[in-house]
A protein has these predicted regions:
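Divalent metal-dependent phosphate-bond-processing catalytic cores, especially two-metal-ion Mg2+/Mn2+ enzymes
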Residues: 1-54
Length: 54
């Protein structure tokens, strides 16, 4: 769907920007909680930034 495609683009953009801007762990966790919804996006975010949400 268009909504899913848009969400994928948003999450991909955030992944790039969080990395390029060297954001803090707190900022990354906030983006994870408030923006990310797609399972593969969450996994990539967690793997890229070594986020432990367990």
């Amino acid at each position: 769907s268009d909504d899913m495609d848009y969400q994928i683009l948003i999450e991909a953009d955030f992944l790039v920007n969080l990395y390029e801007d060297n954001e803090s762990a707190d900022a990354i966790r906030a983006v994870r909680k408030n923006i990310f919804r797609i399972q593969s996006g969450l996994k990539i975010l967690d793997d890229m930034f070594n986020i432990n949400n367990g």
